């Protein structure tokens, strides 16, 4: 039994590799496929902090419609959450001002998504969705301890 490693990639749904298997003709071969996803480049946490700070400069109607600008409290809570994400070494896929007033973060992996929203009202909610079953919405207490728990929940949900 021979075991070999062949670097390959998936292109248009097909496995492509550059190594010929002709040299193994007639041998019993154990083939194991390990999929290692490509990851986005590492996040620049300081740039992300600065970007969230920039949300304080937005005015009502920032989206060219009637979106309320994020409140200073929503921005502060979003920064606290970003710090917890940095501590957890788990970067959001994206974050932006929310059109309902506040700041929203999206975490995605395959079909699963978690959207965390810091509303101008002071409330914080997390929506967990897999694209198949009904989304689940959870209320989150606006404090660092709850954000640490939420980061664990997000990691677990996206990697189930």
Locate predicted features.
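Amphipathic, interaction-prone secondary-structure segments
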Residues: 75-120
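Eukaryotic low-complexity, non-globular regulatory regions
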Residues: 1-92, 125-160
